[in-house]
């Protein structure tokens, strides 16, 4: 994304609060876990730039996104096609993804089954399993902390959408 929201509790309709999507990836699997489709896209900026602070996190600069990016509306349509074939959407910290995707769908006036599709958050569902100490009991584990707990090692290139969804699928 272009950064983080000013107000994490703001409604998705507060479009100025929610950052812009820069990259998206998804893996569509059948009921037994076999991959049906894998997609990854950089979004071509339209009316916004990618701040250096955000680029430092995910490695996608405004220049790279202009050069390699795809118009957001094309990506939203492909994503909607995948969602329409899905029983569940699974992600790590899905509440953030819901706000970012929801804001982009609203900005582009695109109808989607995204909001009504059942969701599973690997971050929230693995909290008791990972048992990462926090200020008030266990904290929500990062994707890295979940991966370390399950496999005994970290992974490279966190915050690249394809890497993150591939690791989420593995977990």
Question: What are these language model-derived features?
Answer:
Residues 55-78:
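Metal-dependent phosphoesterase signature
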Residues 15-16, 65:
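A short acidic, glycine-rich active-site loop
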């Amino acid at each position: 994304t272009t950064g983080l929201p000013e107000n994490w509790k703001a409604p998705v309709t507060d479009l100025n609060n929610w950052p812009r999507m820069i990259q998206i990836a998804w893996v569509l699997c059948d009921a037994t876990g076999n991959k049906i489709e894998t997609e990854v896209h950089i979004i071509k900026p339209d009316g916004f730039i990618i701040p250096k602070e955000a680029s430092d996190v995910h490695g996608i600069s405004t220049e790279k996104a202009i050069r390699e990016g795809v118009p957001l509306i094309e990506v939203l349509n492909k994503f909607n096609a995948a969602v329409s074939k899905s029983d569940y959407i699974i992600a790590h910290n899905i509440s953030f993804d819901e706000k970012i995707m929801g804001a982009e769908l609203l900005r582009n006036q695109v109808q989607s089954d995204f909001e009504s599709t059942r969701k599973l958050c690997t971050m929230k569902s693995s909290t008791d399993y990972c048992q990462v100490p926090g200020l008030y009991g266990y904290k929500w584990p990062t994707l890295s902390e979940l991966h370390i707990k399950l496999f005994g090692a970290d992974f490279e290139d966190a915050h690249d959408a394809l890497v993150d969804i591939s690791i989420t699928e593995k977990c």
